């Protein structure tokens, strides 16, 4: 829901307005916490909100209770499974073999005791193997957060969160709807949309999408400063788009950001692509690697991907592996 565990006041107010509008329109709403959210904060007031048709998943405590809806074809059981790590599940099922994310979700699903004669829907927030990522999502080392899609086989529909690009995983009824807005320039080619799922009798699921048009789109441009500031170039562009501009001038343009923002007020990123920047990048990359040991390189990679340092046990393991490999070990 949010992009941090303690969201800004503005973000909370916006979400509150959104939920109030849905409730006014008698739209039943189902919410789970994601990997950026605080599950405890998200769950606050959940028991009160369900009286208004807003269902918030509680903090995972070893079981997932279905919300049962009724229509002319019978019951629809909606299960809300927030983002969980293997440790979150293992603490409740110490006798189960839980070594990775797939094991954790498999055990969590087994505890739901699905009635497969009825329609079952799962709302969850995990990275399912095979999904296409963008730069906006957190990535775990070596794909350790992967969940195999087979754990969802008994559900009639699985609504997934976490990946920003809309896509199906394996079958049509396991889907990421994606984010409603673009979050980085790596998503510039995404077609953002809302997924509409119509369920009739058991086994009859129709899926369609409604494309979303943002107030401001994202745009990338490349050229010389003179080219990009010519009226003939920009007069037919949406100048209010969020811009990433790459200048190819050999000399830096003084106060380029300030000058470009006169024409492109939502300039988000400015780069140069010329002989100097290409040479500097190549020199730095080669020099930095040559000066570092294999252990230093691995340690830096680990810190970048995990936002924390290795512990002493991990450091010793890597030291030993490096010594074996670089000193002729097998």
What are the roles of these predicted feature ranges?
Residues 2-6, 32-42, 62-65, 85-88, ...:
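Active-site environment of divalent metal-dependent phosphoester hydrolases
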Residues 23-25, 114-116, 150-154, 235-238, ...:
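Short, conserved loop/helix-junction motifs that constitute active-site signature segments
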